[in-house]
Amino acid sequence: MAKYQKLGRDSSARKALFRAVVTALFDKERIETTEAKAKAVQSIAEEMITLAKRGDLHARRQALAYIYDESVVTKLFNQIAPRYADRNGGYTRVIRTGVRKGDAAPMAILELV
């Protein structure tokens, strides 16, 4: 059994999907996606916020290497990270919302706390 969910994609497509979902999450602060994608991306988003809390140049460059949009990185470091200055983890939550109409895929909302 795999240690992570493959989500029906090869490794490069999966990495691109995770980067896109993380970028969208920090841009919108709340996204609806499948439950499997939300759970897979949740830990990556938490790591990015912890990185942003460090706030140094190296952390910013590491975030820029992962997040697609530079303006989203700026928002992460200037607006989102200070919000969680006194919080040690648990920056996101997954709320199950039922199933998608077309294919009955379990859906969930991934949002910043």
Swiss-Prot record:
One of its GO terms (biological process) is translation. Gene3D superfamilies: Ribosomal protein L17 (3.90.1030.10). InterPro entries: Ribosomal_bL17, Ribosomal_bL17_CS, Ribosomal_bL17_sf. GO terms for molecular function: structural constituent of ribosome. The keyword DNA-binding does not apply. The keyword Ribosomal protein applies. PANTHER family: LARGE RIBOSOMAL SUBUNIT PROTEIN BL17M, RIBOSOMAL PROTEIN L17. This is Large ribosomal subunit protein bL17. It comes from Symbiobacterium thermophilum (strain DSM 24528 / JCM 14929 / IAM 14863 / T). The lineage of its organism: Bacteria, Bacillati, Bacillota, Clostridia, Eubacteriales. The gene is rplQ.
